[in-house]
Amino acid sequence: MRSNRQGVYRSLLQDRRTRLLLAGLGASSLGDGLSIVTIAWLAVRIAPANELGLFVGLAVAAYTLPGVIGAVAFARLLRGRPARAMLLGHCLLRAGCLGGIALLYATGMLAPHLYVILLAGSSLMTAWGTAGQYTMLSELGGPEGRMAINSLASAQVSFATIVGPLLAGLLLVWVSPGLLLALDAATFAFLGVVAWRAGAATKAVGEPIDARAAESGFRLLRRPDLLSLTLVTWVFFFLYGPVEVALPVYVAADLQAPAGLLGVYWTTFGVGALAANLITGTIRGHNMRRITLLIIAGWGGCLVPFAFAPIPVTLAAFAIGGLIYGPFIPLTYALFQSSATAVNLPSVLAARSAVVMVSTPLGTAIGGPLVGSLGAAGTLAGSGLATLLLAVVASVLWTGERADAPKSMT
């Protein structure tokens, strides 16, 4: 297995364009890892009096949610454009807006409303940038390498999520948050340059889904296979949302433990997800939808012990949960990449991102009321049970689809 895994990755990394794109994505992921902490910390610094909690929440949301608006607003302009142009546009917008925030903060001119506006502006192309990224990955990896290249990109995100916040916490003791946002802006500029240099890969073989090239992504999402996959992904991420609220309360209130234990939970999860992403790239010739269902059920099962088990058991369950949860994103993207041809893939992925983008924030929003009524442990276990139910429903939903379609998705 190990030699097979190394062979798959070695074959991909022999291509200069693949190395360039992955290097850019890795740098950008690390920059975003820094910004997980930095954006909220800068919001704390400049928040209006008596509005700290509201303003921090608004700033964090502004860095993500306006991408839904951009997915719709820019559809006519970007439909049919090269994938690298979409990714470059996203990178330029991120770099420009984040760089503007850093400059205004350094000169003492960053007002709270300008901060939110610039964060929102930076996220307008998020859906199209993600679409461009995964279209380029699909083209570079080809049918045999999609899972592997998706997994490498996801592994970089997992690594950045582990290291970035820790590094930001250390650096913010010595440097201003504006400087770290300037660094994040530089990583996006770097990604834009290398993505453009990576160029267009060989197009996927096959006819467009419809006679028209670059058809509307939202129209294509009505296809039963794509619609069911999008719905399952949306609900899965929605059910994950309450975990982000309940786990800190579980550690602080239920266990009466220090913040360090919360860090241990998330670190074990992140390490598990990182390892799983690297392993997932070797999956070939398997029924990808069946594996996706097993991931959903497995993650749900790992949350149930929080209702009754001691700390060592829940730590082990959460680490195993990271191993199980980690491959979900590269797997589901591989399913999309194989369900649409290159001409339609960017529009489909942008529409998918616009729909899915709001799921986790909505789940997080209901996490507070759920913790208040069910308790933290009850919310974690309830999320797990609901996720297990989702696996059952999704299994029924996918029963009627063609059995040979998933096998072509590697």
Regions found by a protein language model. Give the residues of each.
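Juxtamembrane intracellular "pre-TM" segments in multi-pass secondary transporters
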Residues: 1-19, 200-231
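A single, central transmembrane helix in multi-pass transporters
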Residues: 22, 26-46, 53, 175-182, ...
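Hydrophobic core of transmembrane alpha-helices in multi-pass small-molecule transporters
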Residues: 26, 97, 110-128, 313-327
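Transmembrane alpha-helix termini and helix-breaking/packing motifs in multi-pass membrane transporters
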Residues: 38-47, 102-107, 163-183, 253-254, ...
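Intracellular juxtamembrane helix-capping segments at the cytosolic ends
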Residues: 39, 128-141, 327-340
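C-terminal transmembrane bundle of multi-pass solute transporters/carriers
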Residues: 57-96, 100-101, 247-248, 252-410
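Cytoplasmic helix-loop-helix junction between adjacent transmembrane helices
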Residues: 118-159
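Helix-loop junctions on the cytosolic side of multi-pass membrane transporters
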Residues: 135-139, 181-209, 286, 396-407
